[in-house]
Amino acid sequence: MAITKMEAGIHKGQYQVRIQPVNPVTKKRIKIPVQYTGSKQEARKIEGELWAKVKGGYDYDQAASFVPDCLVDFIDHQGTLRGWSKRTRSAWNNTLGIVSEYFEGVRMERLTEDVVRSFARKFIADRHLTVGPNSVIARVLVHMRAFCHYYVGAVFLRNPVPRGAINVFFKEEEQSLKQERYTLKREEVDELVAEIKKELDFSNPLICISRLAIWVDLQTGMRPQELQALRWSNLVGDDENGYYFHINDAWNDVSKKLNGHLKKRKHGESRDTLPISFELKESLDKYHESQKQYLREKKIVNERDLIFLNLNDYQKSASGFPVCQTSLNEMLKRLGDKIGIDTDLKWSLYSLRHTVATKLANTPGISYPWAASVLGHTVSVFMKTYVHVNEEIDGKMRNTIGKNGLF
């Protein structure tokens, strides 16, 4: 009987509700917890709800599983199915460590929005962390939302981790602003290029690698990974129409290999960068000759045709590795110190990308779709992520308004 009135025991006088459906695939009986209620009418209602869940695809076995165990299965399955990179899998494993600590003994069926909210706030309090769009808790909640979405319909009626969970779980006054990146002023760009040119010595290609890479980035705004993957064959154009890079690849510093595609682009997709100056083109030509001579002397073959091959390490250059991002960032900071850049803002190769994007956005008559295209972005992402107020334009606008205000 699905509904039985108990005649003895602690549930005496109550109605027991039990259903025993069979899994159509495995032919095994599905274990569903027995429930008790005080009236037969309520018992029939519960019975109907239980059968409705079964027919709707509710997975009782999964619902009774512990959250960390399900996350392990999810990571293994999705990582294999989607071919996650080492970096992606490492990020998910970090989330797994946190979930295992805070959701130990919690079953999937008990995972609600309130439970997730309590976890998020306790995690921040325990570790004295800040809350923001790039914070640890933001990443963990994004991962948890993706994980829970996988079980919507089978365990959850709706995702217990809401979209934009940071803004749902924390008030604005509890959040920290995203740390801005430093963007160079025009005179600082000129000073940085002047310092690079002063230090270049084409008789010693080892000195030129990082400095030329920074100069190229200052003129093109490429991502560091794209800069590392640059081949000599990517440099195209002519004296009449100018020179630029036609790129289609990016380097992965973690896996130590080329991705075979640009960021978030299909294999085979390519794009043209911003034009480079004739002075930079001539410097690259001189460096190319110096690089070839050095490789001949060391009996190294540049099989990947990399422009910024790591010549400072024989084993890495022989293996076809480009200069690493750490070396490029260290060189940029050293050059920045020389020209007097002192800032608490983020200051790295990506600052050059932000600088280029900001300059593009404030160039009169510029086409935003074109500007976004040469940087490898959609217009919306270009505007939201990389466009900053240009200090020169800001000063002009304030002078235009004048000291007496707008009215």
Please report, for each region that a protein language model flagged, where it lies by residue:
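Basic, Lys/Arg- and aromatic-enriched nucleic-acid-binding interface segment
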Residues: 138, 164-224, 228, 240-241
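Conserved tyrosine-mediated DNA breakage-rejoining catalytic core shared by Y-recombinases
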Residues: 11, 18, 230-286
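N-terminal DNA-binding module of tyrosine recombinases/phage integrases
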Residues: 11-16, 21-114, 118, 292-293, ...
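Short, basic (Lys/Arg/His-rich) helix/loop patches that form interaction surfaces
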Residues: 198-204, 293-303, 314-322, 326-373
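Short, polar N-cap/turn motifs at the start of nucleic acid-interacting alpha helices
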Residues: 235-242, 365-385
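N-terminal DNA-binding recognition helix of tyrosine site-specific recombinases/integrases
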Residues: 4, 95-98, 109, 129-169, ...
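C-terminal catalytic core of Y-nucleophile DNA break-rejoin enzymes
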Residues: 259-286, 303-334
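Catalytic-site neighborhood detector that most strongly recognizes the C-terminal catalytic loop/helix
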Residues: 183, 251, 375-399
